[in-house]
UniProtKB/Swiss-Prot annotation:
Biological source species: Rattus norvegicus
Cofactor(s) named in the record: Zn(2+)
Subunit (UniProt): Interacts with DPP4 (via extracellular domain). Interacts with PLG (via Kringle 4 domain); the interaction stimulates PLG activation when in complex with DPP4.
Active site: E217 (proton donor)
Protein name per UniProt: Adenosine deaminase
Family: Belongs to the metallo-dependent hydrolases superfamily. Adenosine and AMP deaminases family.
Length: 352
């Protein structure tokens, strides 16, 4: 019998990666169809190789994508399908609004240098990837009755892609795309300051494109400071290490900065040492502005309920705190004000 959800009410999720939320069945299907070798030929086998049960380092976790992304990248049908199935997955989890993020370049095989995942050059550009994801998400919205928007990721190791990410955010603004992100390995020294990223973020500020940045996950509080002061981020992806700099943390508390918290992810990537108190406990105690999110459910063998169960069982989170953090997530979403108001009204009504 399925476990009763830790929070059985409508939820808002702001930090989840499309390419980390693919059904193993879909990976197998396209691996077979396209003649691409996968590390296993059953759903269970694939889940065990891609999935994680115990902590690995962030680079080891990122290496998991190498196993299965070649089955999906460069294939129009696969890309539209993973977007559609993502919406179905979230609807089943009781999520009523979700912002899903991905790098258009990592799904393309044309007009992208270098071509990712050792693919041969094809004819699928990053621009068309965004169009396909939009189609899949919009069809999913119609079919499953929830609201979905998307965030396009710049990648820390590829600053040359970032100007195009900004252009795609502008081109597809409100055609599901609501913001820009900076993802990838934040241990790359000085990557927040690479000119490609800085210029793209400056352009986003100028053009009214919303901004979030992965920072302080495994990186130091200094990476968070760079995200806030140089990249002018409006939300912090993860941000756990912010609390190591009291002055910065207190400043961000006062500024009502939103932290996109992914508890189960932080355990499995080693971003959080279980011998210490999790930053989210501090966020709760200080009534900070944060959300709970699943990050990469395929790899973490999880749903968003996994994160709620973890903080409820191990950290004493209450129903009232769950309501508060979801209302904060809605307030910190990148929806236009009128749609944000509608979402909030729905939550207030359902939470009475």
């Amino acid at each position: 019998m399925a476990q009763t959800p830790a929070f059985n009410k409508p939820k808002v999720e702001l930090h989840v990666h499309l390419d980390g939320a693919i059904k193993p069945e879909t990976i197998l299907y396209y691996g077979k169809k396209r003649g691409i070798d996968l590390p296993a030929d059953t759903v269970e086998g694939l889940r065990n190789i891609i999935g994680m049960d115990k902590p690995l380092s962030l680079p080891d976790f990122l290496a998991k994508f190498d196993y299965y992304m070649p089955a999906i990248a460069g294939c129009r049908e696969a890309i539209k399908r993973i977007a559609y199935e993502f919406v179905e997955m979230k609807a089943k989890e009781g999520v009523v609004y979700v912002e899903v993020r991905y790098s258009p370049h990592l799904l393309a095989n044309s007009k992208v240098d270098p071509i990712p995942w050792n693919q041969a050059e094809g004819d699928l550009t990053p621009d068309e990837v965004v169009d396909l994801v939009n189609q899949g998400l919009q069809e999913g919205e119609q079919a499953f009755g929830i609201k979905v928007r998307s965030i396009l990721c710049c990648m820390r190791h590829q600053p040359s892609w970032s100007p195009e990410v900004l252009e795609l955010c502008k081109k597809y603004h409100q055609k599901t795309v609501v913001a820009m992100d900076l993802a990838g390995d934040e241990t790359i020294e000085g990557s927040s300051l690479f000119p490609g990223h800085v210029e793209a973020y400056e352009g986003a500020v100028k053009d009214g494109i919303h901004r979030t940045v992965h920072a302080g996950e495994v990186g130091s509080a200094e990476v968070v400071r760079e995200a806030v002061d140089i990249l002018k981020t409006e939300r912090v992806g993860h941000g756990y290490h912010t609390i190591e700099d009291e002055a910065l943390y207190n400043r961000l508390l006062k500024e009502n900065m939103h932290f996109e918290v992914c508890p189960w992810s932080s355990y499995l990537t080693g971003a959080w040492n279980p011998k210490t108190t999790h930053a989210v406990v501090r966020f709760k105690d200080d009534q900070a502005n944060y959300s709970l999110n699943s990050d990469d459910p395929l790899i973490f063998k999880s749903t968003v309920d996994t994160d709620y169960q973890m903080v409820k069982k191990d950290m004493g989170f209450t129903e009232e705190e769950f309501k508060r953090l979801n209302i904060n997530a809605a307030k910190s979403s990148f929806l236009p004000e009128d749609e944000k108001k509608e979402l909030l009204e729905r939550l207030y009504k359902e939470y009475q």
